[in-house]
């Protein structure tokens, strides 16, 4: 009833709302007091781009990619910023060798890859005494996974993932080391206005305050406050993580019993608890050519959607054909559990129809 809509985002009530959202996010995530946080344009992608354009070039760069979004950051570094980075690339379902990363360089990676359903298992591979910065695209990890803040210098997320919110805005979290980089280094390339994090050689305090770099949607802010208050009311971060883990546990139990499905992630320690990605392991399916596999997976996704039991459950367009189940903390684990018998039914129906037509 006190929603601050229809007012300038520069008005005192609107600034109070923006600050409330950031204070709640800080509290629930357990950010260190000296980390800065602010709303930025362009969703999680915009937040990562701001960090890359503003901070890279001071030292060597290494990028890790094991699915589509990590590869996007490689493209930006190479094609747009003209950096010659060291790249660590793995196929869908796997992680690159984390022990091969040189943290004397700046390191960019995705904490949780929703296109593959593969996450990094923890932050143990990141040294505390690193010389370079770590930039972690954590869009679908924040609020659903434990993040070791002392290992991370730049963290990004968006409201529409684990908080189930609206799109359009991202959130940028900066460590003191990241702020020091911003204030001591100026890139050689022009930086678009929307990506500028400094003013006169100092961090733009408005961005990490309530004076956003451009006009935010106050509807998005109000929705985020509502989601964050709900998160706090159910027990904060531990409760959010537990909800996603409960959904994953239900899928794990089902996978153990079905002969037809498995996780795309090959190492159990890397299975995402938010973007749960399933591969079809049935020997009949595995023997099909790529076009036939895509057709079967598409029929499976459409059958689930027709029954209204799962929407938009198709695998990512560049990933191996299969299914993706969103299991962020705003999803009831009981709903994920209720979906699983429908997967058995839909696959059995399609397999029987395909066999009859053969």
Where are these regions (language model features)?
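Conserved N-terminal alpha-helix of the aminotransferase class I/II PLP-enzyme fold
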Residues: 2-50, 54, 68, 75-76, ...
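PLP-dependent aminotransferase-like
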Residues: 46, 54-107
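Active-site phosphate-binding strand-loop segment of PLP-dependent enzymes
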Residues: 91-143, 154
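Conserved active-site segment immediately N-terminal to the catalytic lysine
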Residues: 149-160, 170
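Active-site C-terminal subdomain of aminotransferase-like
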Residues: 160-254, 267
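Conserved PLP-binding catalytic core of the aspartate aminotransferase-like
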Residues: 262-303
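PLP-dependent enzyme catalytic core of the Aspartate aminotransferase-like
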Residues: 317-358
């Amino acid at each position: 009833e006190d929603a601050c809509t229809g007012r300038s985002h520069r008005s005192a009530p609107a600034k109070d709302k923006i600050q409330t959202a950031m204070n709640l996010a800080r509290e629930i995530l357990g950010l260190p007091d000296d980390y800065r946080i602010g709303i930025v344009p362009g969703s999680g992608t915009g937040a990562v781009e701001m960090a890359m354009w503003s901070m890279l070039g001071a030292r060597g760069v290494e990028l890790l990619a094991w699915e589509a979004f990590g590869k996007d950051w490689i493209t930006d570094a190479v094609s747009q910023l003209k950096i010659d980075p060291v790249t660590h690339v793995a196929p869908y379902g796997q992680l690159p060798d984390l022990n091969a990363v040189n943290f004397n360089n700046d390191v960019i990676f995705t904490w949780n890859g929703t296109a593959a359903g593969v996450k990094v298992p923890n932050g143990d591979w990141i040294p505390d005494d690193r010389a370079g910065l770590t930039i972690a695209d954590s869009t679908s990890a924040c609020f659903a996974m434990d993040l070791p803040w002392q290992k991370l210098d730049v963290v990004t997320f968006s409201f529409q993932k684990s908080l189930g919110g609206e799109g359009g805005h991202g959130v940028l979290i900066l460590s003191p080391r990241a702020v020091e980089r911003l204030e001591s280094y100026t890139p050689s390339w022009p930086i678009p206005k929307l990506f500028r994090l400094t003013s006169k050689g100092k961090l733009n305090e408005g961005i990490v305050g309530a004076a956003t770099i451009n006009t935010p949607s106050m509807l998005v802010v109000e929705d985020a406050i509502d989601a964050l208050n709900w998160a706090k009311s159910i027990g904060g971060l531990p409760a959010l993580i537990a909800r996603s883990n409960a959904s994953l546990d239900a899928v794990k139990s089902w996978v153990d019993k079905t002969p037809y499905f498995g996780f795309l992630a090959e190492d159990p320690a890397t299975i995402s608890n938010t973007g749960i990605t399933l591969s079809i392991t049935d020997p009949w399916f595995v023997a099909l050519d790529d076009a036939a596999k895509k057709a079967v997976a598409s029929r499976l996704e459409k059958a689930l959607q027709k029954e209204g039991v799962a929407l938009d459950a198709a695998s990512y367009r560049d990933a191996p054909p299969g299914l993706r189940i969103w299991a962020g903390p705003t999803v009831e684990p009981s709903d994920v559990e209720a979906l699983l018998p429908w997967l058995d039914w839909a696959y059995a129906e399609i397999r029987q129809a395909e066999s009859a037509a053969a």
